[in-house]
Amino acid sequence: MTRIAFFGHDAADAAVRRRVKSFVGDGLEVTGFMMRRRDSDPDWENVDLGKTRDGAFLQRIAQVFKGARKAAAHREKLADADLIYARNLDMLACAFLAKRYAKLDTPVIYESLDVHRLLVRKDIVGRTVRFLERSLLKRSRALVVSSPGFIKNHFERYYAGQYKAYLVENRLSADADFGPRPCGDACSETVAPKKVILGWVGNLRCQRSFNLLCALADAFPHAVEVHLHGLPARTEIPVFEPEIDARQNVRYFGSYQSPEDLSGIYASLDVVWAGDFMEAGYNSVWLLPNRIYEGGYYATPSIAPAGTETAAWLQRHGCGFVVEEPLETELPKLIEKLVSDRSEITRYVNVLNALPEDIFVQPAGFMRDVVRTSLGGESAT
């Protein structure tokens, strides 16, 4: 059995948890070497590398060095691994430092799920961080990205020819218990609810998205209800609960377990917001969020801003709403249309139900193939 040392930025993060499950489901053994943003009890064997704070960049840099020392102190566990899998640039640096401290030559895979704002800066800071990424990327066995937008707009721009890339989208894991898909067609006998329920699910980290949804709640106090599922990034949305408390048709449900809670969440929604502007103009334009796959599996259509990789994905599959700027005026127009006529929602529900399941669910053995080919085994199919 192939053994993986997984260097993760937050042991409690839902995406980290999903990746571990996908490895284990594909027959790979995982030992975590992970930092944490909050206390948690991981489902896997884990070496705690210390606590970090969201947005505290200097503290995270210091923790990279401390974490590497802690990882190297568990040299026997680290040496048992056939492969190191490092998520995000800070953990990639931590992994290479740990290798140096422990005097190991274990191959490394770099997973980049976001292109951090520092990496796109044009000044000396940006050039320095890109130099670090380039040097570590060249020493990595492979690169894993969740969106082709990251390859086109970042890695090919700065590091063309210096890496071997795999696209691993943020799909549901094949072995996870996320329940059955809805019935094949939107059932005509079901009585349509009086309100359009619009959800925002996952990392709630975008002030503009929050403002747009609150504005929709104000514009349609009796016709629209906004549901928020997940944890807010306090550094990005400093005033959160007071805005929710001021609106009777905005409901915050807090954190959730993925995939266990997904079926109930998406069953309660008519549409899901899939926009992000936290890093507008670069990362937010290039990413493909979890919610388009989760919502797609449960036949809940997404709404995305035009000109983004998410919008292109929805248009390619013909399964969601794309809204042009200015969103402050165009998004309310769409919602007003859906309030008065739900047929477009029904049409996209039926399209989503008709799409192949593997658009939303990662096939069994997919991550095993990525690992095998990275280590020089058979070609992936």
Q: Where would I find each of the regions flagged by the language model?
A:
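Conserved donor-binding/catalytic core segment of Leloir-type glycosyltransferases
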Residues: 5, 144, 187-208, 213-217, ...
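Acidic anion/phosphate-binding donor-loop and adjacent secondary structure
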Residues: 121, 166-167, 171-194, 206-211
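Nucleotide-sugar donor phosphate/pyrophosphate-binding loop at the beta->alpha transition
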Residues: 65-66, 106-107, 115-136, 174, ...
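A short, active-site helix/loop in glycosyltransferases that binds the activated sugar's phosphate group
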Residues: 134-178, 312-313
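Nucleotide-sugar-dependent
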Residues: 208, 255-293, 303-312
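Nucleotide-activated donor-binding/catalytic signature segment of Leloir-type glycosyltransferases, i.e.
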Residues: 230, 237-266
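Membrane-proximal helix-turn-helix segments that form the acceptor-binding/catalytic region
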Residues: 68-76, 93, 101, 110, ...
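A charged, aromatic-enriched C-terminal amphipathic alpha-helix characteristic of glycosyltransferases
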Residues: 325-332, 340-374
